[in-house]
Every structure is written in C-alpha cells, then in structure tokens.
Amino acid sequence: MKLFYFILFANIISIYSFNIPLYRFWNCIGIENNIDKYKPYEFKVGDIPLIAWKTKNNSYISTLNFCKHFGSKLDQGWIENDCLICPYHGIKHNNEDSCGEIITYDNKLWWAYNPIYKSPPKIKYNNIEYSSDNTNYSSDYTEIIMNEEMPSCMYNSMDINHAQFIHRGIFGFGSDIPIKNYKHHKYNNSKIGTSFDHYFKKNVKIVNKKMSLKDNSFTSNYHEFIYPSTTWSVVKHSHDKELIIHVDMVPIEEFKTKWFITIRSNYMKDDISKNVLKYVTHQILGQDKIQFDRQSKNILLRNKFLLKKKLNYEDHINDMEKIFSNYSYPKLDNFLNNF
C-alpha cells in the first residue's frame, strides 16, 4: 500500500511539476573543482542573487547576496569560522541566514529553495547510471554562457535538424545524409526522449578512434530531456563504445543561460583523448553560441510566432513546447513573495 501511494505521489509531481517555480527544482550552479573553497561563490538563479561558502565539514551554506544591515553585497566578503563576513561592517552570516539548500552530486553543486525532490535528476540508460561514481567511464567538465533563454537552449540541445547546418564543419558531426529509425519516447510530463541513427562522418570517426573509414556506418543515438533544465545524450558505436554528453542549465538573465557540460566516455579515458574530446566539445558549443547570438530577442515576435513552423523529427520538440508552456523565468519579486 505504501508503494502505491509513493507511485501516485510521484506521478502527481511529474504532472504538475512544470507549474512549480524553477527555484524549487535542483539547479546546477557550479562545477565543484572550479570553485575556490576559500572564497565566497557568487551565483544567480534567474534574477535571484545568491552567495555560497564552504564550511569546515565540507558542506555549503547559501544566502542572498545582500547584507540585511546596510545592504552591501557579500561576494567580496571573507569566510571565518564557517561564517561569511560582510566587508562593510563585519556582520557575520551563518546557517541562520541561509536561503535555500546546496548539495553536491556528480562533482557539481546544486541549489534549490524548498526543493520538491530529494536530489538532482539521475542520468540512467539501460539500467546504467552515468555519474562520477561509475568508474567504467571517464568524466570531464566544462561550462559556457549562451545568449539565449533557457527553454530555447533546451530545444537546441534536443534538436536533431540543426546539426546539418550549424555543425557541418571539420569539428562538427552534422551531415546531409538523413537520420534513420527516429523514435519519440514520452515517459511522463517531465521526461521525454528520442532515439535515432546518425551518419558517422569520417572526421568524427578519427576523433573517436574508429580507424575503419570506408564503411557508411551509423551511430546509435539516444537523447533525453528532464524538465526543467537537464538534457543528455549517449552516442554508441562499435558495439560497446559510448560517449555521453550531459548538460545542466541555469538561467542567469532572461536571455542568458549558463551551461554546465559533462563529457563521459568508456573508451577515450586517457588524458590526451579527454583533452581532444573537450576541445571538440568547445568547438561544437562555439558553433551553437554563434547561432544563439543570431537569434531574435524580440519577445513580441517570439510569443506570436516561435515554433509555428515545423520540420520532420520534431515530435519530441512539440512535447517540450507543451511542457514549457507554464515555465516562467525566476523573478526576484516572485521569489521574495514566497520567501
């Protein structure tokens, strides 16, 4: 009976989760190894200005980046005895001043205010969890800021059709050869997937250490979107070789989104191969960044016409559009009304 109620509750959350403010989901805010643990770490979730610092027991405290004394920002303060000290008058900020919670998962920091889930989304495929705990895969991390709203960044990361045009160069995987075996997977109202076979270009084969260049082989691909801010994909070739690209996003302005990218592989695990993968990933991200800079930021036109034209292989995009229909960018006034 308990299991029944648990499943019922989980389904209710998945149905209504896209009406819940973004700040109540776990938002990736940083790659832990990139954060100086001896200094306060400044971050934003939408318009909500926040600051975090690490304590002696390796936990994190977060609060608004605002001293409730004379209103100083706290990012130029310092950490002393697990307190964040305001640089203006030395006011101490501790756990009693906390705003939201921070946890560490998959070598990343995640923040949420009154979270609806106990932990960030797990990335699983064929009963395999892709995380830093899985020693069969090497993991590397990078980040980039894109000049685009988060929903459109999500559409891009799940879109199949733009690769032919945006990623067709020497460091791209795009091809004029059509994909095969497209399938749309709808799991619930907060998670969807798509699978397809993609032509394996010669330049990509070389990077992926596949030296047989004559065959017209295809890779097996699976992409998944987990509302509100996670997408990931696994590319399989040569039976057992897997490359996983996992992106967690957080909006930092209405048309500015920070991407935290995880690169995983079970066959390119040495340092040279990892650096090659990271370099190619940055090239591909740079190609997307150029397109995002070309995107119109006219809100009236977007609200009226965005996604009114459709292409093949966009069933999953149509569902994403429905899921995002009630999404709203996190405004500070809305957050403070619920604080």
What is each residue range found by the language model?
Residues 23, 95-96, 106, 243, ...:
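A short, structural micro-pattern
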Residues 59, 117-339:
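C-terminal catalytic domain of Rieske-type non-heme iron oxygenases
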Residues 3-18:
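N-terminal chloroplast transit peptides
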